């Protein structure tokens, strides 16, 4: 399922220093400092309104910080020329375009062969010329993943992309994302409310609480991870109990 010809690690290192973001008089992100290694899979968890999605948008360049620094391989986003793509809870497919055209949306030149390749990588080779309306929710998210992969990301941002899916489809998508990440070695940054999902997928789990980092824990478990594994359950309990402390 590897979608790039490169064999060397291409994930981008992210350095965040004293990052702050205010909206009016509300300080949503408060002095966050952290480093994410190139090729690392990091999950950001926390309650609604904690600032985790705002942090994701800042890293993606969709919002500008009020203060602080964001560096990608030691340079600003623009100067680094890092390829950053995003997946959302909503697949955001255009209903009047075929699946293959949704995958290549905005691309120029001869991208069709590459489009077919990434559709194969996500298990949708047979659906290239279908309309989005004929696909299930899980299949639509696979198209969204293919659309992200065709751009050969250095950083893949995942903003609750699986939260609307049923349990079985969600598990299948988790396995697919993990496999593609392992084969293509980009940096992955996942925002999720699901602590089990974070523990299953991530090398590192970061808890954001009221705009600050409340917990930053490494995940030592080998892959692939079984959600019934005792150590996984214990790590899930550790993170969940910390989230619930202030309730």
From Swiss-Prot:
Record-level GO cellular component terms: plasma membrane
Similarity field: Belongs to the ABC transporter superfamily. Aliphatic sulfonates importer (TC 3.A.1.17.2) family.
Superkingdom of origin organism: Bacteria
Protein's name according to its UniProt entry: Aliphatic sulfonates import ATP-binding protein SsuB 3
Cellular compartments annotated: Cell membrane
Membrane topology recorded in Swiss-Prot or TrEMBL: Peripheral membrane protein
Binding site for ATP: 46-53
ABC transporter domain location: 14-235
Catalytic EC class: translocase
Family annotation (Pfam families): ABC_tran
GO molecular function: ATP binding; ATP hydrolysis activity
InterPro entries for this protein: AAA+_ATPase (IPR003593), ABC_transporter-like_ATP-bd (IPR003439), ABC_transporter-like_CS (IPR017871), ABC_transporter_ATP-bind (IPR050166), P-loop_NTPase (IPR027417)
EC code(s) of this entry: 7.6.2.14
Reaction equations catalysed: ATP + H2O + aliphatic sulfonate-[sulfonate-binding protein]Side 1 = ADP + phosphate + aliphatic sulfonateSide 2 + [sulfonate-binding protein]Side 1
Main localization (coarse): membrane
Function comment: Part of the ABC transporter complex SsuABC involved in aliphatic sulfonates import. Responsible for energy coupling to the transport system.
Keywords, comma-separated and alphabetical: ATP-binding, Cell membrane, Membrane, Nucleotide-binding, Translocase, Transport
CDD domains: ABC_NrtD_SsuB_transporters
Gene designation per UniProt: ssuB3
Subunit annotation: The complex is composed of two ATP-binding proteins (SsuB), two transmembrane proteins (SsuC) and a solute-binding protein (SsuA).
């Amino acid at each position: 399922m590897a979608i790039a010809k490169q064999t060397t690690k291409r994930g981008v290192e992210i350095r965040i220093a004293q990052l702050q973001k205010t909206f009016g008089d509300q300080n949503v992100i408060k002095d966050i400092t952290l480093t994410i290694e190139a090729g690392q899979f990091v999950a950001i968890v926390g309650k609604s309104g904690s600032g985790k999605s705002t942090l994701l948008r800042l890293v993606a360049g969709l919002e500008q910080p009020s203060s602080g620094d964001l560096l990608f391989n030691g340079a600003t986003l623009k100067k680094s020329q890092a390829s950053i793509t995003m997946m959302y809870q909503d697949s955001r497919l255009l209903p009047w375009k075929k699946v293959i055209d949704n995958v290549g949306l905005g691309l120029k030149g001869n991208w069709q062969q590459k489009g077919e390749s990434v559709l194969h990588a996500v298990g949708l080779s047979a659906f290239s010329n279908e309309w989005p309306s004929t696909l299930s929710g899980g299949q639509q998210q696979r198209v969204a993943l293919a659309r992200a992969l065709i751009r050969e990301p250095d950083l893949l941002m995942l903003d609750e992309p699986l939260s609307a899916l049923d349990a079985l489809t969600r598990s299948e998508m988790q396995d697919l994302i993990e496999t593609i990440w392992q084969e293509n070695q980009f940096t992955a940054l996942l925002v999720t409310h699901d602590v089990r999902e974070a523990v299953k997928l991530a090398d590192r789990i970061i808890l954001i609480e009221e705009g600050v980092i409340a917990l930053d824990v490494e995940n030592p478990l080998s892959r692939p991870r079984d959600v019934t594994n005792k150590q996984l359950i214990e790590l899930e309990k550790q993170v969940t109990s910390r989230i619930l402390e202030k309730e």
